[in-house]
Amino acid sequence: MTPTLISAFLTYTLITALTPGPNNILALSSVTSHGLRRSLRVLAGMSVGFIITMLICAALTFSLVELDSRFTLVLGWIGAAYILWLAWQIAKSKPATGTPSVEPVGFWASLGLQFVNVKIILYGITALSTFVLPVTREPVWLISVSLLLAAIGALGNLCWALAGHLFQRLFLLYGRQLNWMLAALLVYCAVRIVVE
């Protein structure tokens, strides 16, 4: 993997992990409403579910590419298109707000959320098909990168959880500017994918 591709990979994964999504909003909302200690099982469920989902994404993406190597190119273009769509959605979105719930979500509910969380499924498929499979098809690399993707995603959830009210206030104050900056960085990622 070239330094340019690594920088695009890290930019994509960090932005995707830190931008608003079901997990991040749930983490923010749970900690804001119930405190960090009572929200640990929510964060644990998300993390375990994230690992399982990333491994499933790796198996699915690898299978498609093994079926026909042209899928790498197709998935790369689809990944670039998805990143551009994500950039547009972020650029036009309003700042995030967390809606508190009555009781904190449990471990199993937050784990189950991962299997219907389109954002992380596309995150895994896009990262693997765009940044890993064009370079190597070694199972150890696919598994390692899947675990790295899950760790980066869990780190994003933890950042939102720890930031709590402070992060929410910052999004309310500077959300538009932040969204435009993140969108521009995602456009950079998409361009690097197509150029690489």
UniProtKB/Swiss-Prot annotation:
GO molecular function terms here? amino acid transmembrane transporter activity
Listed under GO biological process in this entry are: cysteine export across plasma membrane
Q: How does it sit in the membrane?
A: Multi-pass membrane protein
Cell compartment(s), UniProt: Cell inner membrane
Which ranges make up the Cytoplasmic topological domains here?
22-41, 92-114, 161-170
User: Which regions face the Periplasmic side of the membrane?
Assistant: 63-70, 136-139, 192-196
What the protein does comes down to:
Exporter of O-acetylserine (OAS) and cysteine.
InterPro entries attached to this UniProt entry:
LeuE-type
Q: Which organism is it from?
A: Klebsiella pneumoniae subsp. pneumoniae (strain ATCC 700721 / MGH 78578)
The UniProt entry's GO CC annotations, sorted and at most eight, read:
plasma membrane
| Catalytic reaction list | O-acetyl-L-serine(in) = O-acetyl-L-serine(out); L-cysteine(in) = L-cysteine(out)
Q: Which Pfam families match?
A: LysE
Q: Which chain regions cross the lipid bilayer?
A: 1-21, 42-62, 71-91, 115-135, 140-160, 171-191
This chain's protein is named: Cysteine/O-acetylserine efflux protein
To which protein family does this belong?
Belongs to the Rht family.
What are the UniProt keywords, alphabetically?
Answer: Amino-acid transport, Cell inner membrane, Cell membrane, Membrane, Transmembrane, Transmembrane helix, Transport
